[in-house]
Amino acid sequence: MYAVIKTGGKQYKVAAGEKLKIEQIPAEIGSEITLDQVLAVGESASLKLGDPLVNGAAVMATVVSQGRHDKVTIFKMRRRKHYQKHQGHRQNFTEILINTIKA
């Protein structure tokens, strides 16, 4: 069984037992969270689509860790004008383990 969930402005296809890095959620490590924005639920040949969400569907997950992604370097330059600008960014993430999918 799999589900398509929406969290942090992004959509993820998840199945039970998967580990997933999502946008940061303020939750303690080891705590159980419920992701209730489920867009679709599928099982082998059948697919249940929401309009926009599937009624009564939820995904239960456990927070495994909190962290930061690798640094992304931004470099801006204007040719012949002696303008150069360096900037870096590190995005926070939450790693979760999908426990169950309730449809």
From Swiss-Prot:
Q: Name one GO cellular component term.
A: cytoplasm
The Swiss-Prot or TrEMBL record annotates one GO molecular function as: structural constituent of ribosome
Q: Please indicate if the UniProt record lists Cytoplasm as a keyword.
A: no
Q: Write one Pfam family the protein is assigned to.
A: Ribosomal_L21p
Query: Keywords in UniProt for this one?
Result: Ribonucleoprotein, Ribosomal protein, RNA-binding, rRNA-binding
PROSITE patterns per record? RIBOSOMAL_L21 (PS01169)
Disulfide cross-links: none
Q: Name one GO biological process term.
A: translation
Q: Which PANTHER family match?
A: 50S RIBOSOMAL PROTEIN L21 (PTHR21349), LARGE RIBOSOMAL SUBUNIT PROTEIN BL21M (PTHR21349:SF0)
Which family is this protein grouped under?
Belongs to the bacterial ribosomal protein bL21 family.
Q: What does this protein do?
A: This protein binds to 23S rRNA in the presence of protein L20.
Subunit arrangement?
Part of the 50S ribosomal subunit. Contacts protein L20.
The UniProt entry, under NCBIfam families, shows: L21
Kindly provide the name given to this protein in its UniProt entry.
Answer: Large ribosomal subunit protein bL21
